[in-house]
């Protein structure tokens, strides 16, 4: 299934049905009086979180959604039927944003959660409604009220416990494929990963969801490369695992490049708990590894973990550290409502990972 995390949608709720002007016409009843019924209410537009969805791809092929209008009132005091509501299914973690792309309308954090995005118009009154002691035969009725219409943006922010960040080719996808059942595309060229990937990781008696996003390069916040739009998918993570390639020219500069993009991002990513790890240690000499480790230590102000995603060396220690920090890190306010359902509702339908072993 293709991945789509943003879609522009037009929605319109149903108009209310018109009221009816009618009079009783029965044998032996000379002055039957008014009998026009009220119009039905227009259908609502409702957005609902569906279990098992992990993309907004359905909204690439259909962008216009209109609820049916209410039925007009009829004679013999028959009221019109209400229009049927239409329900838009979205994944857990979806946000509804106004057309200006800045105003947040609603944020979904629970499976099954519903939000009425546009209410249908009220039905008009029939002439029976206007009958009074001074007006025994009213000949007026109200038209139905129009429904609401608007353009909105649906934006998906995946809910995971930990997020992988780093430059392109830092080994993030390889690491994810080794510790979970996820099968991201892996190759030796930059930007192999074009869309976020999720995997469920078992670390001893702990289980957590790990998100891999496309690599960041200098100037990503200005649109360079794939930009920083995918950072929204790790905005709700408790912990960031920052992988740095040991074979790069300068590990410290590589680390600072990514940190600069995190700080330039509008969210709170730069304030999140961060675990720094030096990857691909099997591909460098002992002397170069020590030099890169010292550079990274000075840049990050902490001792980095060492690992190799290919051989598995150091991976158990990284997973245990991740699991421990996840248990202690504060949960984002927006992610609290997701609870244990996040892994079920957001993770693509891949096999559950077995406890990792080298």
Swiss-Prot record:
Domain of life the protein comes from: Bacteria
Top class in the EC scheme: hydrolase
Residues the record lists as binding GTP: 166-173, 191-195, 212-215, 279-282, 308-310
Short name of any one Pfam family annotated for the protein: MMR_HSR1
Domain Obg as annotated: residue spans: 1-159
Record-annotated OBG-type G domain positions: 160-327
Primary residence: cytoplasm
Cofactor(s) named in the record: Mg(2+)
Compartments where found: Cytoplasm
GO cellular component terms listed in the entry, alphabetical order: cytoplasm
Keywords assigned: Cytoplasm, GTP-binding, Hydrolase, Magnesium, Metal-binding, Nucleotide-binding
Known EC number: 3.6.5.-
Record keyword Transmembrane helix present: no
Family annotation (Gene3D superfamilies): GTP1/OBG domain (2.70.210.12), P-loop containing nucleotide triphosphate hydrolases (3.40.50.300)
InterPro entries for the chain: G_OBG (IPR031167), GTP-bd (IPR006073), GTP-bd_Obg/CgtA (IPR014100), GTP1-OBG_CS (IPR006074), GTP1_OBG_dom (IPR006169), GTP1_OBG_dom_sf (IPR036726), OBG_GTPase (IPR045086), P-loop_NTPase (IPR027417)
Keyword Metal-binding among record annotations: yes
Function: An essential GTPase which binds GTP, GDP and possibly (p)ppGpp with moderate affinity, with high nucleotide exchange rates and a fairly low GTP hydrolysis rate. Plays a role in control of the cell cycle, stress response, ribosome biogenesis and in those bacteria that undergo differentiation, in morphogenesis control.
NCBIfam families referenced in this protein's UniProt entry, alphabetically: Obg_CgtA, PRK12297.1, PRK12299.1
Subunit structure comment from the entry: Monomer.
Protein name: GTPase Obg
Organism expressing this protein natively: Nitrobacter hamburgensis (strain DSM 10229 / NCIMB 13809 / X14)
Taxonomic lineage: Bacteria, Pseudomonadati, Pseudomonadota, Alphaproteobacteria, Hyphomicrobiales
